[in-house]
A protein has these predicted regions:
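Non-catalytic nucleic-acid substrate-recognition regions in nucleic-acid-modifying enzymes
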Residues: 1-135
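Short loop/turn segments at secondary-structure transitions that flank enzyme active sites
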Residues: 41, 97, 145, 154, ...
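Beta-rich nucleic-acid/ligand-interaction surfaces
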Residues: 132-139, 198-199
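C-terminal edge-of-domain segments
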Residues: 137-153
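Conserved S-adenosyl-L-methionine
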Residues: 171-283
Length: 284
């Protein structure tokens, strides 16, 4: 579960609160948190986490020397248990001090391995869609190892589904949530953002104060993966809605630009917290 630098500890605490995982099942690393969790936990984290950028399932870790080793490693992953050849996919690759001369070529070799594996196992190859793929595969290469992941989130998790109106430099929802976590605010005392812009911080705070899960208004990548069971997912949604409650603290926001206050009010309405936040225009 990748996150912004410095947020790892807060994310680990959040994942523990969501799943109950502890000890060796929940480890903090540089730029993210790793968990040994169930498929149900993966869906629950997607639904409830405010801090992670996405939830990735690690499928393999392999030593390599060249691009052909990448092909071999990717061809040994059972992609056919995750999606079908009728679906589209995309390879995203990142590197940390990799000796490879071209990451684009490395991604192409992994893509070929996935497609060839499907042709061998299912008789046809899935197509690539670099814009709106059904399935996102992530590859990370270090000087010696290749790690392959399948994405369960789809669009980045900062996209909550309620922000339609935004200013010129909107604050990502995950960063706003990290700022709230770092402040130590526990939803029992009032919160005031005097430069609220389009309302990101007050809206995140209001949802926290009301127990509203951040992912209730969006779709997720796991809904297109073969392990997905809709009745289990609907149960998690119902469970989340059952935990919503009246606000535990008042939330306030203001901005010198009345246009931004209007944006904030409309965003708050879509986020289900319009009656929880008091917005006003004026100089801080």
């Amino acid at each position: 579960m990748p996150c912004a630098a410095g947020v790892e500890g807060f994310l680990a605490d959040e994942v523990h609160a969501i799943t109950g995982l502890t000890g060796n099942d929940l480890m903090t690393g540089r730029g993210g948190v790793m968990a040994r969790a169930s498929w149900r936990d993966a869906m629950r984290i997607n639904l409830h986490s405010r801090l992670t950028q996405r939830v990735l399932v690690q499928l393999s870790v392999t030593d390599y020397r060249n691009e052909n080793d990448l092909y071999q490693a990717a061809s040994e992953v059972a992609w056919e248990i995750w999606f079908t050849p009728k679906q589209t996919f995309k390879i995203d690759i990142t590197a940390q001090h990799s000796p490879l001369t071209s990451l684009n070529f490395a991604a192409l070799k992994i893509k070929d391995a996935v497609a060839d594996r499907f042709r061998a196992k299912r008789g046809e190859r899935p197509n690539v869609d670099t814009t709106w793929p059904d399935v996102r595969i992530y590859a990370h290469v270090t000087p010696e190892t290749l790690t392959l992941y399948i994405d369960t989130s789809g669009e980045p998790l900062f996209k909550r589904g309620w922000r339609t109106d935004k200013g010129d430099a909107p604050l990502k929802e995950t960063l706003a949530a990290a700022m709230i976590a770092a402040s130590g605010w526990d939803a029992t005392v009032p919160l005031y953002d005097p430069c609220c812009g389009s309302g990101t911080i007050p809206i995140e705070a209001a949802q926290i104060a009301c127990g509203i899960a951040p992912g209730l208004q969006r779709r997720f990548g796991f809904e297109k993966l073969l392990p997905f069971q809709n009745h289990v997912w609907q149960g998690l949604i119902e469970e989340a809605r059952d935990h919503e409650h009246e606000p535990t603290a008042p939330i306030f926001g203001s901005d010198v630009a009345f246009r931004m206050v209007d944006f904030a009010e409309r965003n708050a309405e879509r986020a289900g917290v319009s009656g929880v936040i008091e917005f006003r225009g004026g100089d801080a």
